[in-house]
Amino acid sequence: MVAYRNKSTELYATVSEVKRMARIIKASRMSQPSISQELQACIPPKEISDALVDCYLRTFEGVFRVLHVPSFRRVYDAYWLGTTPAKPSIIHKFLLVCAIAVPFYTGPDQAKLRVSAAKWIQAAAEWQCAPHAKSRLNMIGLQIQILILIARQVCGIDGDHIWIPAGTMLRTAMHLGLHRDPSHFPKISVYHGEMRRRLWATVLEITAQSSLDMGMPPMISVNDYDTKPPSNINDEDMGNGIDTPLDVKPATVFTDSSIQIAFTQTLPTRLEIIRVINNLRFDLSYDDVLHIGTKLISVCREKTIFFKSALAAGRNITPFQIKMADTLVRRFVLCLHRPYFSKANENPRYHYSRKICLDTSLAIYAPATELAPGEEDDWTRMTHRCVGFFKSFFLYAMSTVYYELNSQINERKEDLALFAPLVSARPATTPPSLGLTSLPPQYQLLRQVLESSRQTAVARVQNGETNAKGVVFINCALARIDALIAGTDPEVAVLDAARSSTKEMSQILASVYREEHGEDIDLSPSSSSFAGREHGRGEGADDVTGKHLPTGTGAQTGSSNSTDFSCFDGTMDGLNMLDSDLGDVNMGFDIDINAYMQGLPMDSLDGFHFGRSPEWFYDLDGWAAGSNFGNPGYGV
């Protein structure tokens, strides 16, 4: 052992030579990741890059801590000065930051930047998956993994399916030892120890959010790690690899880490909520639901007051970050109470859950800042563009408002029937009025929320989202509500709304393509290998899911589950054709997430379709069904 450590010995020289030959042989067997000329050509100019970096720092960096901002700015400035050659990892990190910022950029060529952002994300993902992965199992590699997951959701690049790569991110972090507190490793500098705590907190938050979003277990518990929360310090207090003691601020002082610390305080509770509501046996008592929900609401209120005071004092925090921090925690309250939401109509004990679900949904919908008509802030831009869990809480909130408004209309009809005269003096030739003579007390407010959600859904398509279903179904929901109020046939109203919405979406999507590419979209069969009904779920889908498990957003050619908007030219039964790719899915589990999200019993019932995302919302038969929406066996 002594001879091996002595660099002057023959053994040391021989071992070094053997290792060097091994590295050369491995390197010769695979190409090294590099920056392609195509990627270099779409790097934005410095003026635009500066604006994009500022957009990122005022939005997501304050919520999901990934970078040490002073260090990042030094490397960023050195890149533009050209003093040192930029490594691929540095360029990918810089471009991912720019990609996340694109939706918040208001300068010229925003539409073309959307196209570039997709290329930046794809290039970073390819670099991350390239051979010789061991060289990327480090802090920079983990930072890039995190940025890719955020960018995919912000830019709508497969952002609705991040639970799987989020699991890879979690395991990468644990492989690097981030689940153990840096105090266990004396050789780690103070700077790197603090960065490890920050990254671990971000990894846990993304894991929790994506697990809640997909209805899946988080695969981590508080017993699996002992890493402490980040210290309450600003980035400038950390140094850069310098082993100096940290000047930790009191908890009452706002710092760059305050939002992340607030997340970690409620994380154990939120992980338990995910475990319980995704448990196949749902073993939480209603008293525990009330206790946990009240605790989370209290924390949300307390932290929002603290962050607002920091904003008023001119600290480094923005309205976007306050709103995002509140919503990402508050959405857990909504999911916790949803199983009891619809039960409140039959059991007064659960009326509090009905109130909490509505209040939470309205809080999520509340704007971050007061805006003039047509004006946008960062929060509005986020709602108009982002997907993943940044979109899901709006779907959950909007569906809650719809269910509540539907319940209020039904209750108002029942109340009016109680006071109706037993005998009417109206001539027999006069048809009875089927509409409501007086509206529910919150009708205007709740309908305004649904109208706002419709405008948001349209804006999302105008800003690059390619899923037109959201607009169609929100229009159907509004049409059904209006028909119930007016006393007209809701099925006819839903069908008319579906027809007009699909035509509107066709025009908007054509306009979006023209804006991004400067030419009209080519719908000929040969224009793209991914166009048309033949795309379905992709090659080999039947080998994985089975022919009778159309679990995605499309189906194979010739299947009865194929999606075709021409179904709106038929009768009301034709609406099944549009939604059939979302229904009729039974994966053999004992629980139905759709039942949970609709507030139905958590046992398995024949006829339910199983889904792990807000796709349960896209059920046109449900919108037309009224009081039957969500009942077993209806529309499936």
Where does each model-flagged region fall?
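Intrinsically disordered, low-complexity transcriptional activation domains
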Residues: 284, 382, 453, 459-467, ...
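Structured alpha-helical bundle/scaffold domains in large eukaryotic membrane-trafficking regulators
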Residues: 68-76, 109, 164, 181-188, ...
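Short, glycine-/Ser/Thr-/acidic-enriched flexible segments
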Residues: 102, 210, 217, 271, ...
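C-terminal transcriptional activation/regulatory domains of eukaryotic transcription factors
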Residues: 6-11, 20-140, 147-158, 185-191, ...
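C-terminal capping/lid segments that line or modulate ligand- or cofactor-binding pockets
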Residues: 389-411, 464-467, 471-491, 499, ...
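Long, amphipathic alpha-helical regulatory blocks in the mid-to-C-terminal portion
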Residues: 96, 115-145, 165-183, 202, ...
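Acidic/Ser/Thr-rich, low-complexity mid-to-C-terminal regulatory regions of eukaryotic proteins
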Residues: 223-283
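Acidic/serine-rich, low-complexity amphipathic helices located in mid- to C-terminal regulatory regions
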Residues: 55-58, 150-234, 261, 268, ...
